[in-house]
Amino acid sequence: HPVYLWIRDDVIELRDARGLWGKDVSETTMSIHEELGDGNIQVATVGQAAENGVLFAGIIVNQARAAARTGMGTLMASKNLKAIAIRGTQPIRVADVTRFTELIEELDDRIYGHDEYAIRYRLGTTKLVSALNKIGGMATRHFQTGQFEHADKVSGEAIESQYKSKTKGCFACTIPCSRYLVIKDARFPELQMEGPEYEPLAGFTSRIGNGDLALGLKCVDLSNRYGMDAIAVSECISWAMECYELGILTREEADGLDLSWGNGETILALVDKIAFREGFGDLLANGAKGAAEQIGRGSEELVMHSKGLEVFQADPRAVKAYALCNAVSSRGADHLRAEPWFEFSGDGAEGHRDGAAVQAQF
């Protein structure tokens, strides 16, 4: 039966998780906190997508941090492991407390005085919406173009002005580049969430032709709750929309859904259908490459992937080093394996020294 792993200091045990199976990431996290009586427990868990065998289900930490790529959540759920809960209570021993404290203060001063700190504090990675759109690198309508006409409506600045409640940092991190949002929209009552980061934000807006910010944020929240790789989900949906646009897929094959770009009702329905492998979502839950191999009809040529891993939200025609990254990275299209800041900066010396100052310009 399902279990979760509970680690408290050096005591490790497997606990019954049958009552957690079928719950989403947020529900699971809060249930574990309640069961163990400690809200400071760090929880890494899977959602319903992993339980249902969605091939790109991830592991979500503390409800919002996603180890999402390559389906590790799916693998975890296949072992009947619902979550890993960790709590450390013992002090960390330091050989030289005085020097250690001095180094912390020195690093804190450098961080807080850095030009990048202020923009990270305000916008986090969502600052990239405006930056990438400006240079033609924002994945739009399944990479048909690199600029989105509604970028200003779905930017980090738009989130800050409309929905931001307060900033926050990840566990033990000095830089509070994340944020709590309260989305006041009659369609999504009581929608409160952390984030988003650039990848899911762009994935559920420009990539699928959606200029409705609140809708995009709702999709990000659902993707996290179900425990899915937002890059993969947005690729599956945008691939299907382009196939529909080109006449490769019909409305009947998509459960009667209108796959026109930016159709909010369709987008929300597909996120649910994929997570629960229902109808057309069962096909997409195999990933865009797998879905295309099953559909055929030339749809294989439309899939944006490398080695089966869906391409992230940056158009390599604008940032060409990303094309090299996508080609040679061991697991495919992976923005975590290469960050070609020299191409943003135009500084050929980048990569031969600390690039923090260059990154701060963007």
Spans of model-derived segments:
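Active-site-proximal gating segment of KS-fold condensing enzymes and close homologs
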Residues: 25-29
